[in-house]
């Protein structure tokens, strides 16, 4: 069952869902909560590795990822990060989100941004039960013009579903959870699979 606005507000009031800083009532509508863009970004450095072998030895994957990913880029409030056509970049939400073991979250991009070519999540839009941390955004500019992205702009919306029961293996209890408590634009850790 997807939570409606009044259920989302109740879960926030009761501390079952935690969003910090807590969004104002104007950002909760129908079935979702608007989330804002954070200040941290990472980009892919072109031509620093010939390829990444996604099924190769984990040490080679880790080395290739380290070569192609930039250090974290901090964009101050009021300034912009420019995402160029065909560019993939990582960023994070401004808010940190914590979910209990019986709720799953879903991140949706904004239609108004998609109509300009911005994909907010390339594929990964599920926020697992037991998740706690900021949400990494996988931006792609499929449009024809560079897009200026500014910290604290509305970037997407979260909605929540109750599970049929409490998850036996929520994210925060899994020993192999690669992105547990992430706070920045964390690069891929596929080498830890």
Swiss-Prot record:
Keywords: Hydrolase, Nucleotide metabolism, Nucleotide-binding. GO terms for biological process: dUMP biosynthetic process; dUTP biosynthetic process; nucleobase-containing small molecule interconversion. It holds the Pfam family DCD. DCTP binds at residues 110-115, 128, 136-138, 171, 178, 182. The active site is at 138 (proton donor/acceptor). It comes from the Bacteria. It catalyses: dCTP + H2O + H(+) = dUTP + NH4(+). GO terms for molecular function: dCTP deaminase activity; nucleotide binding. Gene3D superfamilies: 2.70.40.10. Pathway: Pyrimidine metabolism; dUMP biosynthesis; dUMP from dCTP (dUTP route): step 1/2. Its EC number is 3.5.4.13. Catalyzes the deamination of dCTP to dUTP. Belongs to the dCTP deaminase family. HAMAP family: dCTP_deaminase. Homotrimer. This is dCTP deaminase. It comes from Aeromonas hydrophila subsp. hydrophila (strain ATCC 7966 / DSM 30187 / BCRC 13018 / CCUG 14551 / JCM 1027 / KCTC 2358 / NCIMB 9240 / NCTC 8049).
């Amino acid at each position: 069952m997807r939570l409606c606005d009044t259920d989302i507000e109740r879960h926030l009031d009761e501390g079952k869902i935690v969003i910090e800083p807590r969004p104002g009532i104007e950002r909760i509508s129908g079935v979702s909560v608007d989330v804002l863009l954070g200040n941290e970004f990472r980009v892919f450095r072109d031509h620093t590795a010939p390829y990444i072998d996604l099924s190769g030895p984990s040490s080679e994957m880790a080395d290739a990822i380290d070569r192609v990913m930039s250090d974290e880029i901090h964009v101050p409030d009021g300034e912009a990060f420019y995402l160029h056509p065909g560019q993939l970049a990582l960023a994070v939400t401004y808010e940190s989100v914590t979910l209990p073991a019986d709720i799953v979250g879903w991140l949706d991009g904004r239609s108004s941004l998609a109509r300009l070519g911005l994909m907010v999540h390339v594929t990964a839009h599920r926020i697992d039960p037991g998740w706690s941390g900021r949400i990494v955004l996988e931006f792609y500019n499929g449009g024809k013009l560079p897009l200026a992205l500014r910290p604290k702009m509305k970037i997407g919306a979260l909605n929540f579903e109750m599970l049929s029961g409490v998850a036996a293996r929520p994210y925060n209890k899994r020993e192999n959870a690669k992105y547990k408590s992430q706070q920045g634009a964390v690069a891929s850790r596929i080498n830890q699979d």
